[in-house]
Amino acid sequence: MPLVVLDPLPVEIESLLERRRRLGLDGGDEMWDGVLHVNPGPHGRHHRIQQQLAEMLGPPALAAGLIPAMGAFNIGEKNNYRVPDGGLHRPGPDELFYSTAALAVEIVSPGDETWKKLPFYAAHGVDEVLIVDPLERVVHWLGLQDGEYQWIEHSALIDYGPTQLAKRINWSELPADEVGKVSDG
């Protein structure tokens, strides 16, 4: 349910946001052109997928000279940033707000804004976006070409592709819906 509260924020909203900050519940919140998007914590299936991705993507990322970061980080700047579920970085300094990433990883949650982030990622030069949907058991791998994302069969960054990844994910750890599949767009 979207909710827009115009400035100045009521004391109750300020109190809620401060409480979320204090308790560390705001880690997945995002700022979209100055508009705060308050996101709930992810479902348990999200963490199981995230751990598998860390184990599968880490070795080929390191072999390619990239830095695996399977956990939330900020892409953008203070008043306009997105928080992917993980990614791969090129070597460089650690930052609070990264200007880009080699790869952004998104794990879809019901009703989230994963697909709406693509224009932002493109504008920030994120080379590839890996989207895993645990409910649909689908892996999408997109590469940035001429300012837009296109489905790709193999990463240009690491020795992996969506078909290979979908076959390696242990979907059986998740609620039984469908057998793992790959989206071709």
Labelled PLM ranges:
Residues 1-185:
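Gly/Pro/Ser/Thr-rich low-complexity, intrinsically disordered segments predominantly at protein N-termini
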